[in-house]
């Protein structure tokens, strides 16, 4: 057996029956606690532990052994159920033979042979297709529940269950077309409802449908023969053919629904065949009225289920549409508020631009006014400077004129004085010429030497005399100049 568990999470999902596996569970828990203690000791001794690889392997081994034990117990329970179902079918076949022997000789024996044929085929299918070993806990749980249900049905409540089960028979005459039509509608509605749900359960229901088809065909043939005992063989054969066709349609529909779990329903089909055969043999005489009522109630229930599915679909659509509508409304509100915010931002930007423009214009006008005032002040200061300069110039001119006038007066006085001096010098010269001597200057002579020569002393008084007599202002004389000596 191969281990199909992928991780600890899948392994821990196993369902444990406390009534039958309590001792094994305690042993497993004890082993797990010992293994955990041993793993902790090994991990403390190791420097780099291998991430609990040995622990996971031991847990997988324990889970594999546990699954083997569960599978063996379920297999034995299935064998017991099959044996009990076989004994019940044998009893029912014997009772059907006895009742048919008491009936008139012209009664058709075809349904009995068909029932035996389908029972044999069902058990042959069960033996030829053994149940595969599966490690999935979900499948084991379903199989145990089915086995328990079949066992309790066969042992304790076979009679009550047979009376309560719907009778899969097919009426003859006018009711046959209505019954087949109702079954076809019911099958189509059931197929539409179950197709999206059971896509992954393929081959399991195919075998169940095949077994149910055989049982339904046999039971329908027996019920038809007992409901109308004086019908001929041809009519019975045609009825059984129609029943087989309808059951084959139903089997093909069930086969298209359940696709993945194939060979598991053979034993269930065999048990269903035995129960359906016994129920058909006991209640064929009064089967038409309950079957009609069952069809009506079944149709009503299926219509109710169909309406519920429609309401559920509508509710699902509403649940899907409401969040979408809410999301659209929220997005629209956000878009509106975002547009308003952008519009306000743009308006604020425009207002700021206008305010800045006005402010700039005001600043420019203020600057212009300031420049005008400055130019005015400058022109005023220039004018005042010019006027002050003109005034200063006029004052200076006036002072110059006054000074010139004074200079002219001084010059005139000086000229007068010079004129008088010249006149005096001229008079003195004339006096000297009349009573003094003349000396011609030669070489290096000067007034000091000339005074020594004529007066015997070069005193300043003598020199001054010579100057006065000649009208000299300094000591400068030239060669060849004639000097009067007084």
From Swiss-Prot:
Cytoplasmic side, ranges: 226-319
The membrane spanning regions, by residue number, are: 205-225, 320-340
Cysteine pairings via disulfide bonds = none
> Key word Transmembrane helix present in the record?
yes
Keyword set for this entry? Cell membrane, Membrane, Transmembrane, Transmembrane helix
**Domain LysM span(s) in chain numbering:** 437-485
* Segments of this protein annotated with the region Disordered: 1-314, 351-440
Point to the regions of Polar residues compositional bias.
64-85, 161-179, 233-246
Q: Where in the cell is it found?
A: Cell membrane
Source species, domain of life: Bacteria
GO cellular component term, pick one: plasma membrane
Question: What ranges are annotated Extracellular (topological domains)?
Answer: 2-204, 341-486
Q: Segment Elastin-binding: which positions? A: 14-34
Q: What's a Pfam family this protein contains?
A: LysM
Per the record, where are the segments of Basic and acidic residues compositional bias? 1-40, 103-118, 126-143, 180-199, 247-259, 299-314, 361-398
Residue ranges with Low complexity bias: 204-225, 278-297, 403-431
The text the record gives for the protein's domains is: The elastin-binding domain is located between residues 13-33 at the surface-exposed N-terminus, whereas the C-terminus, containing the LysM peptidoglycan-binding domain, is not exposed on the surface of intact cells and presumably remains buried within the peptidoglycan. The presence of the TNSHQD sequence, corresponding to residues 18-23, is essential for EbpS activity but not sufficient, additional flanking amino acids in the amino- or carboxy-terminal are required for elastin recognition.
This molecule's function is given as: Promotes binding of soluble elastin peptides and tropoelastin to S.aureus cells although it is not able to promote bacterial adherence to immobilized elastin and, therefore, is not a microbial surface component recognizing adhesive matrix molecule (MSCRAMM). May be involved in sensing the environment or in nutrient transport, since its loss caused a growth defect.
- What name is this protein filed under? Elastin-binding protein EbpS
Q: Which organism is it from?
A: Staphylococcus aureus (strain NCTC 8325 / PS 47)
Identify the coding gene.
Answer: ebpS
